[in-house]
């Protein structure tokens, strides 16, 4: 769900990459309620997927 662009694609702004070097990139702040039930469910789902990944990774290295 990220909005990354592939190499060589343009977004309509024809600026050289070095032109924005002097500008600071402002990072968007998020206010996440860590006690919300949907946040807890999301965290459990992410942790579950990560554990599966770790198990698969460990199995393929042996």
Curated annotation (Swiss-Prot):
Q: Which is one Gene Ontology cellular component term of this protein?
A: protein-containing complex
Function recorded in the entry:
Functions as a modulator of calcium-binding by calmodulin. Thereby, regulates calmodulin activity and the different processes it controls. For instance, may play a role in neuronal differentiation through activation of calmodulin-dependent kinase signaling pathways.
Q: Which family does it belong to?
A: Belongs to the PCP4 family.
**Protein name as annotated:** Calmodulin regulator protein PCP4
Q: Which GO terms describe its molecular function?
A: calcium ion binding; calmodulin binding
Q: Which UniProt keywords apply?
A: Calmodulin-binding
Domain IQ: from-to ranges: 39-62
What domain notes does the record hold?
A: Mostly intrinsically disordered, with residual structure localized to the IQ domain which mediates the interaction with calmodulin.
- Give the Basic and acidic residues compositional bias ranges: 12-28
Subunit note = Binds to both calcium-free and calcium-bound calmodulin. The affinity for the calcium-bound form is 50-fold greater.
Give the span(s) annotated as Acidic: 28-40
The record, for InterPro entries, names: Calmodulin_Regulator_PCP4-like
GO BP annotations of the record are:
positive regulation of CAMKK-AMPK signaling cascade; positive regulation of neuron differentiation
Keyword Iron tagged: no
| Top-level taxon of origin | Eukaryota
Q: Which PANTHER family would you find in this protein's record?
A: CALMODULIN REGULATOR PROTEIN PCP4 (PTHR15359:SF7), IG-LIKE DOMAIN-CONTAINING PROTEIN (PTHR15359)
Q: Where is this region: Disordered?
A: 1-40
